[in-house]
């Protein structure tokens, strides 16, 4: 059975739908929420899991608590192992710690949902030691994700 790490940046892409250029920083995030922004990356993660259908049953998923992954699995009805991590409001360091944890536990691949910042955080944490698949979920994607 393949072991897949699954990381969601819960605030990636929120600013786009409300005319902002991202959600970098607490002030901009707060403004996006007030303007009615929704969690784009979480929705994409859930859609990804649902699209796998019965194939998801053949994969051992490892994910982060709450909005960094667990919530998508609960919504999609897919089983997963929740790794140690912060619940509630998270930051880039939580993403880095999760990626390192997945690398240390020899997962086959990390799939992440986020933008350029999330891509950089994961690359900084795992270098090229594990395959990484990015599902673009940011507002202003500039990287090759």
Label every PLM stretch briefly:
Residues 16-17, 73, 121-123, 144:
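Short glycine-/acidic-enriched loop or helix-start segments at secondary-structure transitions
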Residues 65, 113-116:
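Glycine-rich beta-strand-to-loop/alpha-helix junction loops that act as flexible
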Residues 10-11, 116-117, 138:
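Short glycine-rich anion-binding loops that position phosphate/pyrophosphate groups of nucleotides
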Residues 109, 113, 122-145:
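Short, acidic/small-residue loops that bind anionic groups at enzyme active sites
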Residues 1-108:
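ATP/NTP phosphate-donor binding region
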Residues 100-103, 120-124:
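A broadly conserved amphipathic alpha-helix scaffold signal in soluble, globular proteins
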